[in-house]
């Protein structure tokens, strides 16, 4: 039996990844496609313990307090545990996986900690580590949800009802978020991700419009 397909929804905070991944999985299920939606980090699992400590600021109050390679390992372990216990067998038997974040999130957020001249070297290390050494499947398609940064910040503030204390170490650091956006744009170009532009002017496009584009891209992979 041939392996399944892995489609990743990627984007910065406030881009609507969770909503679009959920809608895509529901659409495919309604079409009779064997599908499972996964989300990273897997906060319901003990495997995300180091990720939660990192995001809570227990290793430092700024993202740069934990170097890119150490932070990448926290997330990679979480993905490995999820694959072994939750979705690996389904994928190996031909199932379709829709991922809300994946190794691609490490590519975006950890690149931003490094000088740009080191980005390609880091990406080579990251993908070799997760896909070859750990044996995790590489995505068949990555769909990058691009959102204007001003709109994204407004959406994050609304998410927490104006309570800035609820933001994690990434969300609190606006300079880090700006670097992450630059890294995301680089990754989307360099790694040939599909980009869906989610804003029109100073507002988000409708969820339905964005989902239509997401479904069209998914069909290119699934046939």
Residue ranges and their predicted role:
Residues 31-128, 132-134:
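ATP-dependent small-molecule kinase phosphotransfer cores
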Residues 20:
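Hydrophobic positions on the alpha1 helix immediately C-terminal to the Walker A/P-loop
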Residues 104-182:
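A glycine- and Lys/Arg-enriched "phosphate-lid" helix/loop adjacent to the NTP-binding pocket
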Residues 12:
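P-loop (Walker A) phosphate-binding loop of NTP-binding proteins
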Residues 9:
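Hydrophobic anchor at the beta1->P-loop junction of P-loop NTPases
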Residues 2-6:
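Pre-Walker A (Motif I) flank of P-loop NTPase domains
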